[in-house]
């Protein structure tokens, strides 16, 4: 999609029906006696209908345009050659300026059935902002893959024309529990990587972690594709907050809009402890690990943003029924001082698009920089150790199925063990096998004796 103030869209509005400018988007006549009804029943991601009506140049009510997200984001028609050429030039423009890759958002809704038929009715229990996901005429529509194949041709040709450049594209395709569907996006002629969100969408329990990791690993590793993990992103409450809730271990707390709308009480100390363990989990897995800004600081979700300061269109489109995702998008703190947005800006007189909490500076990079027990220190240690772990190869072996509260796997000479239970658990001998502690999620989480070794509750260890 593109901004509704973009020159191309403004030209399309001015050009009138049947113009080549309108063919770059999805303009259609409305239904009803005077075209007063939208062309079909499609729903927008952020609530409401997916169509908005324009006023024609002569001042009369006119055609409707399609917007999968908001009226300020009209959808491009990716079947249009002008659009294809525009993005070819855009990719090369940024590659010429040293950009090495692109993260491509919302790839699952780029394709459209050319006839734009009505979507099937959805169950009444489906949330207003989830109805769009059940539209088979845009979600995972096959024509989108033609666009990504073309992008890959552009990327490959650029590398040929510029020896030494290594470029990467990664897609954001929400396909939880459907690794075979995810594989479509990482075929050799499409994206280099595609986010695996199964861990992000898993509750805090070893059984769920095992199912999510094993399912993704078996599908992508066997296909020769790169596993691409994430625990946080811009669309979900931060993991420190999610893991700090009393129902964090339940799948029901992790489904649908609960990822962004839960207002259950949060135990931040518990959330931090679990988030530290989860960091070792995801950084121990083979493949690529993506860290969301502030994750390495252990930032919690900001839950008390005033309604007047909220920016997420979900909040406005649902008339405040859903708070949206603003709380994970608050500017990251770099310094202890509240000046210059805790170091986020170099300007002395700047207003943030989202207010920072008063204690944000105490969670900053500066406040954690020299603290060997901080979340930042843990990430630095883990990333340093990960360099050697990567040399062990991509093959891992899962130990158990998580029903004992342990999510465990071996990777070469390393072993990763995560205890999601509320009690210390004995580490099986097949995991220990002469190994010792390399790194713990915090001090004191690993103990060993003559006959047994234990991992503390809500903790993780790397052994080797």
Residue positions per predicted region:
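Active-site and adjacent substrate-binding regions of carbohydrate-active enzymes
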Residues: 1-435, 439-464
């Amino acid at each position: 999609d593109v901004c509704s103030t973009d020159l191309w869209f403004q030209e399309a509005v001015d050009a009138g029906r049947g113009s080549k400018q309108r063919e770059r988007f999805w303009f259609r006549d409305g239904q009803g006696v005077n075209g007063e009804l939208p062309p079909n029943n499609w729903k927008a991601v952020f609530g409401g209908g997916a169509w908005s009506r324009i006023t024609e140049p002569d001042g009369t009510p006119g055609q409707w345009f399609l917007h999968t997200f908001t009226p300020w984001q009209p959808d491009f028609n990716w079947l249009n050659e002008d659009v294809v050429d525009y993005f070819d030039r855009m990719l090369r423009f940024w590659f010429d300026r040293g950009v090495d890759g692109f993260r491509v958002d919302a790839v699952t809704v780029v394709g459209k059935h050319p006839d734009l038929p009505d979507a099937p009715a959805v169950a009444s229990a489906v949330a207003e902002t989830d109805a769009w996901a059940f539209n088979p005429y845009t979600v995972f529509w096959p024509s989108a893959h033609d666009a990504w194949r073309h992008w890959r041709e552009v990327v490959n040709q650029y590398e040929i024309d510029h020896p030494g450049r290594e470029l990467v594209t990664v897609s954001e395709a929400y396909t939880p529990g459907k690794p075979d569907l995810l594989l479509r996006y990482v075929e050799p002629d499409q994206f280099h990587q595609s986010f695996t969100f199964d861990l992000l969408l898993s509750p805090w329990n070893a059984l769920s972690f095992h199912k999510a990791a094993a399912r993704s690993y078996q599908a992508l590793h066997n296909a020769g594709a790169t596993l691409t993990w994430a625990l946080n992103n811009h669309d979900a409450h931060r993991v420190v907050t999610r893991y700090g809730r009393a129902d964090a271990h339940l799948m029901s707390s992790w489904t649908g809009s609960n990822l962004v709308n839960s207002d259950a009480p949060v135990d931040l100390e518990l959330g931090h402890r679990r988030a530290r363990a989860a960091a070792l989990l995801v950084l121990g897995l083979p493949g690529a690990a993506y860290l969301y800004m502030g994750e390495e600081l252990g930032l919690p979700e900001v839950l008390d943003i005033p309604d007047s300061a909220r920016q997420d269109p979900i909040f406005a489109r649902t008339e405040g029924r859903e708070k949206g995702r603003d709380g994970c998008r608050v500017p990251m703190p770099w310094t202890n001082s509240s000046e210059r947005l805790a170091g986020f800006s170099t300007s002395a007189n700047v207003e943030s698009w989202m207010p920072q909490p008063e204690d944000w500076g105490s969670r900053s990079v500066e406040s954690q920089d020299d603290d060997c027990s901080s979340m930042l220190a843990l990430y630095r240690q883990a990333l340093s150790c990960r360099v050697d772990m990567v040399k062990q190869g991509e093959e891992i072996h899962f130990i158990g199925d998580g029903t004992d509260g342990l999510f465990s796997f071996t990777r070469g000479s390393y072993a990763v063990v995560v205890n999601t239970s509320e009690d210390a658990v004995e580490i099986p001998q097949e995991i220990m096998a002469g190994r010792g502690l390399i790194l713990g999620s915090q001090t004191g989480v690993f103990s060993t004796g003559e006959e047994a070794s234990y991992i503390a509750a809500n903790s993780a260890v790397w052994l080797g």
